[in-house]
Structures are given as structure tokens and as C-alpha cells.
Amino acid sequence: MSKRALISVSDKTNIIEFAKGLKESGFEILSTGGTLRSIAEAGIDVTPVDEVTGFPEMLDGRVKTLHPMIHGGLLGKRSNHEHLSQMEEHGIRSIDLVAVNLYPFKETVQKPDVSHQDIIENIDIGGPSMLRSAAKNFEDVLVVTGPTDYNRVLAAITSETDTYEFRQQLAAKVFRHTASYDAMIANYFLSQTEEQYPESYTVTYEKVQDLRYGENPHQQAAFYKEPIQSRPTLATAKQLHGKELSYNNIQDTNAAIEIVKEFAEPAAVAVKHMNPCGIGIGESISTAFERAYQADPTSIFGGIVACNRPVDAATAEQLSQIFLEIVVAPSFESQALEILTQKKNIRLLELDVTSDNKQSNRLTTVDGGALIQAYDAKEVSEADLEVVTNKQPTEQEINDMLFAWKAVKHVKSNAIVLAKDSQTIGVGAGQMNRIGAAEIAIKQAGDKSEGAVLASDAFFPMPDTVEAAAKAGIKAIIQPGGSKRDQDSVDVCNQFGIAMVYTKVRHFKH
């Protein structure tokens, strides 16, 4: 008795060639719906599934293969005499190969203006059931999820590569595939509710590429993306020039994108090791970049730059004068591309860095688990500021403080940022005490600190940071407030004529 293969696919790529190969290898082919028609129209002998089940397709195609004649043929173990006896008793023949790919749920849910009903109708039921049945019984059933495996399976059928390990590999692929498919469906339904943190949280990612290594050469790594992309992200960026991104490139570029999205004005951000080394805003992207560069001309070397406006020729000339790993921007003018592509080692990424990302959850893995939290989207405006000192800040100081506040939000805690005239001039990042971060920022700013403002991501537990700021000539301070010793810091500000405002918002970043 000939072997049987059941084929039911939504993606018809190379399916005719695969069916011909199976036929040449002696398989009887069973099929349904559009796949059946395609195979038959190609002149290949094919048996409709309803001839096997004795039931027609029904409920608008919702029920085709959900039948014991199909699943018995997939799940019956050939080495189990009781299974074989029961199959013979009920007239069930074995099915030896299944080729199924699923309804295009992912593609459907990403269509603009798609209806909820269309999304529902693209949830596959029979397909995953057949795949899982076949994969469970992988010792007896070859299972194929897509065109990339057709040639491998055809080769295995006629050679010694049809091994236990090969079949188990295909089965593992099935369970990853159906788990990912179900995760996308689960997350779609979750998005239709107000529930944020359910009892179980399902995520799935698709591989973008293997990476040369991770943070260090001895660490293996790969880059994955969310399968459903509802907004522009680094994973959807278009690379216009340069070699592939490294693990550290991806981390740093994402950090730069997160920061530059804070600003409505033309802005440029330079990042090293996921911390900003320079941020500038201006009336043009060229001016903004010049300010970001001058913020720290040393640290920007080998860094990543993000711009929230198209890169023009003037800005490209500035960028080309220094060694940069990556420049990411909404677009690059043709002259800018001509200038920058002359540098072999630079990567150019095109991405809409003005899109909103403030509604998304963020996931961080820990050993044995994960932390999930809402994106830190809290914004502070001039109206939110509480002046707590005798001195009132000037309009310029308020503007600089709000600018510095946006910057310090993205600096690793403990974080201090000094700013002046729409430009960061000192960044103290990742220190175990706040005064240490302040000392680093003040030292970096040097003489520029005279008349500058200081932003702190959290409150001052003692007045030492304010004292250091006073010695450096800082004229205004923005911080959350909330310490038991707030008044000590206020007193020092009043002593030295410094304006200080509270935001009542903390921006820890780990």
C-alpha cells in the first residue's frame, strides 16, 4: 500500500514542485480547498480529503480535516499493535507526511483598517491541529511547515538522511511554529482588553539574523524581532549602507532612538555604551548635531548618532569629519548619501524616529524570569514645575531645565546632566552615589558649567550635590524632590542664589 501525504497550505510557493516530488516517490496525495485545486490544475493526481472523511467541508471551510479519519491516521503509532488493530477496525489508513502552513494571521492583523472579523477568520484551527498531531507522532510522520523545508524533506525520503534526529528536528520546528502562532493570537486578544499583566504572559520573536558575537567575542548572540510590528522600530529600520550591525551596535542604536524621540525640535543625539554623551537641539539638524558634537567631542568618537530630521548635505559633511559607527535618521538627502557612503565603515539606517513608542510594555529578563513594566512615558511641562527656592528661574533656565530633564531620563542611574543653551555639557552616569555622578558631570563641563542648569534623575538625599553645583556656578536645578532632607538642599540653593524646581517625577534607569 502506498504512503500518503496530506498537503494543505495557504502559501503556495513551490507547492507544485513538492507535490510532484512526492508523487514521484510513490506518495498518494490528499488535499483540501485551494491547495487541492492548485495541485489538480497542475495535472497531479490528488484525493480530496472529504473522500477520506466521508464529510464535506462545512461552516465556510472552518471544518475540513477535524476528523478521526485524519487525526487517527496521523496519531496512530505503527509500532503499537493495539493502535494498528483499532485503525483497521475503523478503516483508518496511516498518513505518513503532512505539509501544512497556517492561515496568514500575522499578515492579516497588520493590514491597515482590517476588521476584527477578518482577523478572526484568519485564525487557523485545523492546520495547527494537524501539525501538532503529526509532530507528536514524528517517528512515523514527516511534518513540514513551509517551503524552506520542501527540498530537505524530498531529499530525506530518498536517502539515509531520513533519521530519527531529522524527524525530531522537524517536530521541534512545528511546536515552535504553533507556539509562536498562538502567542500572536493571544496577544491580539489581550490588546482588545484592558488587562495589562495577565496570569501568564506570552511572547514570541522571529530571528532577524545571527550576530558575530554578543557584548564580547566569547559570547554567542542573535537578533530577534517581534513578528507583528505596529510601528517603526529598530527591527524595521532600512539599512542603506555599511556592514551588518553588531550586538552592541543594536543596543546603542536603540538607546539613541529612544532619546531622540523625546524632542519635537530638530535634535541630534550621540550615544556610547547606551548613555548619551551629547544631545543638542536647534533650528536645524545641522545646528543640533554641532551642539551634540561639541557637548563631548572626545566621547562621540566611535559612537552612534540619531537625528530626528532628514540628514542634509551640510549635516553629512559634519558627520563625515569624525569616526562614527552608525547614523540613524528619518531619511538622507541624495547629496548626504553621496558624502557619507564614501566612508566604508559607517552604517546608515533609515527609520522614522518621530513615531510614538510610549504605550508599549518593556520586558527585562532575569535569571529564571522576567520583569514587565510600562514604558517610562511620563512627561513634564513648565506648568508641572514647583519652584521651591527664593529665586525664580528665568525663561531660559526653564527651557534648559526641561531639556536637561528629557536627557537625564535616559542616563543610567545615579544620573546627573548639566545643560546650557539647548546642549548637554556634562553627563554623570551610572554612579553608586549621586555626588559621584555630579562630580563627573561638573568635571566634564569645566568652565561651561558657569550659568548652566543641573538635572538629577532622583532626589538629593543630602545637600552635597547642591553644594558642588554652587561651586561650579550652576544657576538652576531640576529634580524630583521627595527626600526627608529636601529642606537642606533648598537652604543651600537659597544661600547661593540658585533656583530649584521639583518635578515630583523620578526617572531611575537601570
From Swiss-Prot:
Family: Belongs to the PurH family.
Top-rank lineage group of the source organism: Bacteria
The entry's keywords: Hydrolase, Multifunctional enzyme, Purine biosynthesis, Transferase
Biological processes annotated in GO: 'de novo' IMP biosynthetic process
Disulfide pattern: none
UniProt domain comment: The IMP cyclohydrolase activity resides in the N-terminal region.
Gene behind the chain: purH
Record has Hydrolase as a keyword: yes
PANTHER family in alphabetical order: BIFUNCTIONAL PURINE BIOSYNTHESIS PROTEIN ATIC (PTHR11692:SF0), BIFUNCTIONAL PURINE BIOSYNTHESIS PROTEIN PURH (PTHR11692)
Residue ranges of domain MGS-like in the record: 1-145
Gene Ontology annotations for the cellular component aspect, listed alphabetically: cytosol
Pathway(s) the chain acts in: Purine metabolism; IMP biosynthesis via de novo pathway; 5-formamido-1-(5-phospho-D-ribosyl)imidazole-4-carboxamide from 5-amino-1-(5-phospho-D-ribosyl)imidazole-4-carboxamide (10-formyl THF route): step 1/1; Purine metabolism; IMP biosynthesis via de novo pathway; IMP from 5-formamido-1-(5-phospho-D-ribosyl)imidazole-4-carboxamide: step 1/1
Protein known as: Bifunctional purine biosynthesis protein PurH
PROSITE patterns named in the record: MGS (PS51855)
Catalytic activity: (6R)-10-formyltetrahydrofolate + 5-amino-1-(5-phospho-beta-D-ribosyl)imidazole-4-carboxamide = 5-formamido-1-(5-phospho-D-ribosyl)imidazole-4-carboxamide + (6S)-5,6,7,8-tetrahydrofolate; IMP + H2O = 5-formamido-1-(5-phospho-D-ribosyl)imidazole-4-carboxamide
CDD domains: IMPCH
Record has rRNA processing as a keyword: no
InterPro entries in alphabetical order: AICAR_Tfase_dup_dom_sf, Cytidine_deaminase-like, MGS-like_dom, MGS-like_dom_sf, PurH-like
GO MF annotation list: IMP cyclohydrolase activity; phosphoribosylaminoimidazolecarboxamide formyltransferase activity
